[in-house]
Amino acid sequence: MVYLLSGGTHAGKTLWAQRLMEAKGWPYLSMDHLKMGLIRSGLCPLTPETPDGEMTAFLWPVVREMIKTAVENGQNLIVEGCYLPFNWREDFQPHYLAHIRALWLVFSGDYIQNHYRDILAHADDIEHRLE
């Protein structure tokens, strides 16, 4: 089974992926880590400031094929990041889709207005938790 976790910034994607990894014992792939590895290695023309749409166009083909490989090999995987396209299903045949679950984490406008300080205060919880 492959779980896809995506959503807006500070929505808790990395924390959810970490908790799923701990609960299930499955590996997880952080698209942010992949992005920064490619950028720092000089293997891609992008920068950390590259717009999300361009970043998605660059990273998604690689991640998509990693997902297919995991399904083909009967392996479990958690993929986490904001660079998953909304139309991701279009890239998979039905026999792959049967093994993929997706969850998008989003905040409503009301939630953001009422909890803005809380969101900022917990923005880096996973990084601090692992120190």
List the predicted regions and their residue ranges:
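Walker A (P-loop) ATP-phosphate-binding motif of ABC ATPase nucleotide-binding domains
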Residues: 2
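Glycine-rich phosphate-binding loop used to anchor ATP phosphates in small-molecule kinases
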Residues: 54-104
